[in-house]
């Protein structure tokens, strides 16, 4: 016979429970069909992780919160869609496959686009999507049979349709424009650039006037870009330079002449107050160039290699050229000085390459696309949790710039724009046979692909079949049920990457915001509040934590630490504590099982007959009300705190203890715990399932799962009975304190009395519980204070121990020893020493005075006790 474990062993049960529930289809839309209620629908979109990704602690937080909500709604009778999926992650995926090919000596350019894409699909089928399997270890109950991929056939068509609609409305245009350019990954949108503070230098360069005698000094952080200068610029109000406006200077090293212009854009206080204008390689200068009709000169190619505009420096890499340019400036006495200078430098969010402003012909989405969604947010048609995030959203949307959507990659959604030999340009959903304008059959498709965020911006509805053909797996069949989605849960770090774009993409195409509620959680940091990184060695691997502590412990911990708006400081101590919490509930079930083999479900308060059973159920009903309220308002940490306090602080610490007096309540306590496990289920799905069946004396293999049982609803309370038990608990705690104060061997307190601030109906119950749980032979309820007694004060009572018949000499001796010890501690503080008081640092003196105050308070209490004990 297999021996029952004495502690909870999550590794033995989690996989089995998950596989059974998944196999039965519980995670699917109709998995809870028997308890679904009419017109109740809930839809939650999983932020699609990169197909290259592995589960990290940030994913674990998002997925835990999402799954808690999905399980709660499923149990609460909602037809629930928790939509999983993967993002094709253009740059990241191409880089992974490209590296693998390079290891084999193959360049993607040698393969060509078509063959390279085949290789990517081969990699995706073999290795991509491992993260989906890893999610299952966490207990994620998404509808995995519906898993979507942003490069699915259906989603590809949705992307093309969105492009076509926006192109026809003039919201997508192609133009030469200043973009963020990564010499490795191509064009980037503004929010794909990460700025870092770097220690650099300000180079003060001499630009000689045409007379070659006088010169102007210009400060720049990028001397290598001087070859692209089209002008020098000063503020029109700067008296130092007014007389020079309109004259020309000679460009250092290459002797091209450029004009001196005036513009209020110049800050007179920065550097020398005279700046170089490089329209081809600076965002601000690009705008200045347009205002003043200056030439835009590009000095390097897409790979960052300097071109013929740079004279002798042609063919040098842009960053490597800097030192050589500075060296040549020094040789020609054109460098006035160099100063240290700290400034913000943009880097590619993927490869960390230094990003360049670069004029390039790209495709853009106009900012006007977002106007309607902005207005609807202001009208309150979608709510942010925490509410302060709307301010961040508004601030960003006010500064919205054209969104560069073209990327110079092979992997991704190829832009559906075709050009014929007669230069007619058009958009097509399918591969066209000829040009609709001139019927030419010589067509070329745009070689660029769309920004990854373009397809993920459609995620809220493209996954539901929008724009897809009837032959596709999903063809708008679910839009009427699940669009708009109900809730979005994600990290605040992708508010602008993804959330804002989903808002305007969805509203623009469907006329309605994609979700009603937007919950943005904080970041997970280490226990010191520092960002996790491999270099610091403080990364917490969720899969390792699941293996060590169990998925339930990790889920519960992350939810518990997710206080609104605050970063999460995670440590293994938290995980250990919540593993102990799971074990505490396990032990409570083991205790109940020793008393009785199985327990029935009792959902209503009126089904409970014993005072303890009714009290426990009444308390559970209050917690049910509070947990529901917390979940409905995305206060995950409040919900977990409520459950922890009830299950450990009330059920295990009190109800189990009370049952040792009121044994006939065991049956009803088992029923209360079964209901509490349903309440706990969304947070800790595995242990709640396991222990529920243990209490039922059933097995999941042969019976229904807790996850498709109704979530507790009843909130009826017996407040009078609750108050009576709160008084009883207070009396027991007070009596225990009294015993601790008095009992010094051989003194043993056998009798005590209780005075109540207000009467309760059943004092006999109080006496019975108090005698048993405070371990006293007799407890009397009185209305007066005994003459010679010591007392303890509780919230609802005052308890007394009569001293008349006790030999108090051991206790008196103990208290006198404590006084002697306190006296020695006072002397150690040195406050009686005048020299110390005179010379000690103020902080040391203040600390000593605080310590003395504490010692004097203790001394006063002990003396009061001695006075009472020694009175005749």
Predicted regions span which residues?
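Acidic, turn-prone loop/beta-hairpin segments
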Residues: 87, 179, 183, 189-194, ...
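Catalytic adenosine-cofactor/nucleotide-binding cores of aminoacyl-tRNA synthetases and other
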Residues: 347-351, 524-528, 532-609, 699-702, ...
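Core structural elements
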Residues: 135, 580-593, 614-622, 640-660, ...
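Conserved short loop/turn motifs at secondary-structure junctions
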Residues: 5-6, 85-88, 116-121, 145-156, ...
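N-terminal, positively charged nucleic-acid-binding surface of large information/translation enzymes
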Residues: 1-237, 261, 278-291, 295-310, ...
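Conserved phosphate-binding loops in nucleotide/dinucleotide-binding enzymes
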Residues: 196, 277-280, 319, 356, ...
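Alpha-helical recognition segments enriched in aromatics with Gly/Pro capping
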Residues: 264, 292-303, 409-412, 416-421, ...
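C-terminal low-complexity, glycine/proline- and small-hydrophobic-enriched intrinsically disordered tails
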Residues: 576, 695-872
